[in-house]
């Protein structure tokens, strides 16, 4: 797959990410003024690309929703997944970074097609396991949850809720993403102090804020400010960063999320590209554990067929029963923690606003994240988005 095609596919993947982020951040899905959320669009993208690999007639709709460059271009999705797994998610860095895991749990009464199994193992670097859903569904659910707990080093202990699989379940496609990064410039914990954070309902809470007097990557606009916090690099070329998108208005998160979803190039146009001196610089510590069942949200994005009796997943298993297979649920859970050390998480046309004229004493930029904001973690060379979320109340962890 050509470099241009990969970049186009990544742009489509980013649009998928921000559309989901907008849906999760909308008032209808957010849980009041304390509904913090975090999810991995990349993890969902990889899992649904696996479904596309096993789909026949359903493939066009999956490819369109996931942002394939052309109609029904499942090969493009797999090429992107292969590039992402081998380049972005290869955890060869001593400084940490992401690790991705895929696993297909299939009932022992079915046999995976060799072509599908080869794709899982070859391009997605995943595994397949034969299990007994028909007589041991609760035990299999426990097995899946134990697998997730192990590969996320205990950050996520359960992905399948009680009763989510039963004797009619035939397949579980699992994908997990774990990320740990240390800031290039860590915050001094002795300077962390409780400050006021304003909630959407007009009230406020006291929460620990990190601060710094060092120059920061910040871009300023009329309606928002964007902060870039780079993570330490290892021995490779990958560059991971967290971005904090802070609307100017205390209740501006909804409008910001909508802009992200309707203007695919919005993020690239607002990237901070250079460091600026800071005046007040305060960022709250936060920890988010967020899980949701994603099928209704995906249906809202136009992905209907895989969840219906019209689903055609006949390229997944070698059996007459393949015609009756469909996706019943999509369970997703993420954990993100931001503190003085860095981040632990599981699950170019950019322009910078520069000073008109540089005075002898550079103008200092304030960045005080004391009201609801969006955040994302991405790999900067490729633009791949690993995690997206929003913070309504830093004191609420779940």
Curated annotation (Swiss-Prot):
Q: Which UniProt keywords apply?
A: Protease inhibitor, Serine protease inhibitor
The record's comment about this protein's domains reads:
The reactive center loop (RCL) extends out from the body of the protein and directs binding to the target protease. The protease cleaves the serpin at the reactive site within the RCL, establishing a covalent linkage between the carboxyl group of the serpin reactive site and the serine hydroxyl of the protease. The resulting inactive serpin-protease complex is highly stable.
Tissues where this protein is expressed: Expressed in roots, coleoptiles, shoots, leaves, embryo and endosperm.
Give a short account of what the protein does. Answer: Inhibits chymotrypsin, cathepsin G and trypsin in vitro.
| Name of this chain's protein | Serpin-ZX
The site annotation (Reactive bond) covers 356-357
Listed GO MF terms: serine-type endopeptidase inhibitor activity
Cross-referenced SUPFAM superfamilies? Serpins
Assigned GO CC terms: extracellular space
- The UniProt annotation puts the region (RCL) at 342-366
Which positions form S-S bridges? none
Similarity annotation: Belongs to the serpin family.
Q: Does the keyword Ligase apply?
A: no
Q: Is Magnesium among this UniProt entry's keywords?
A: no
Originating species: Hordeum vulgare
Under Pfam families, the record lists: Serpin
Q: Which InterPro entries match?
A: Serpin_CS (IPR023795), Serpin_dom (IPR023796), Serpin_fam (IPR000215), Serpin_sf (IPR036186), Serpin_sf_1 (IPR042178), Serpin_sf_2 (IPR042185)
Name the Gene3D superfamilies on file.
Alpha-1-antitrypsin, domain 1, Antithrombin, subunit I, domain 2
């Amino acid at each position: 797959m050509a470099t241009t095609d990969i970049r186009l596919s990544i742009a489509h993947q980013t649009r998928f990410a921000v559309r989901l982020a907008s849906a999760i951040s909308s008032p209808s899905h957010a849980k009041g003024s304390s509904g913090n959320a975090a999810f991995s669009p990349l993890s969902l993208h990889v899992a649904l690309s696996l479904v596309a690999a096993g789909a026949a007639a359903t493939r066009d709709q999956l490819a369109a929703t996931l942002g394939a460059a052309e109609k029904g271009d499942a090969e493009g999705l797999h090429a992107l997944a292969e590039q992402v797994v081998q380049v972005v998610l290869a955890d060869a860095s001593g400084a940490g970074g992401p690790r991705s895991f895929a696993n297909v749990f299939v009932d022992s009464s079915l046999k995976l097609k060799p072509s599908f199994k080869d794709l899982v193992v070859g391009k997605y670097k995943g595994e397949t396991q034969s299990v007994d859903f028909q007589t041991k569904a609760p035990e299999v659910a426990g097995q899946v949850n134990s697998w997730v707990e192990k590969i996320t080093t205990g950050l996520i202990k359960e992905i399948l809720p009680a009763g989510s699989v039963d004797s009619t379940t035939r397949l579980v496609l699992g994908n997990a993403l774990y990320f740990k990064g240390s800031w290039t410039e860590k915050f001094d914990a002795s300077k962390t102090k409780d400050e006021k954070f304003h909630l959407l309902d007009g009230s406020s809470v006291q929460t620990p804020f990190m601060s710094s007097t060092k120059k920061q990557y910040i871009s300023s606009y009329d309606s928002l400010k964007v902060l870039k916090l780079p993570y330490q690099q290892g021995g490779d070329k990958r560059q991971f960063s967290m971005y904090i998108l802070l609307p100017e208005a205390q209740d501006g998160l909804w409008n910001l999320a909508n802009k992200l979803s309707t203007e695919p190039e919005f993020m690239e146009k607002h990237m901070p590209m250079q460091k600026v001196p800071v005046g007040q610089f305060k960022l709250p510590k936060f920890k988010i554990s967020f899980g949701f069942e994603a099928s209704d949200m995906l249906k809202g994005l136009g992905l209907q067929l895989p969840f219906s009796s019209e689903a055609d997943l006949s390229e997944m298993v070698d059996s007459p029963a393949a015609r009756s297979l469909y996706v019943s649920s999509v369970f997703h859970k993420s954990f993100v923690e931001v503190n003085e050390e860095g981040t632990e998480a599981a699950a170019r046309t950019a322009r910078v606003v520069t000073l008109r004229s540089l005075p002898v004493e550079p103008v200092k930029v304030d960045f005080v994240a004391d009201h609801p904001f969006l955040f994302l973690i991405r790999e900067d060379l490729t633009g791949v988005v690993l995690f997206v979320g929003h913070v309504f109340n830093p004191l609420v962890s779940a």
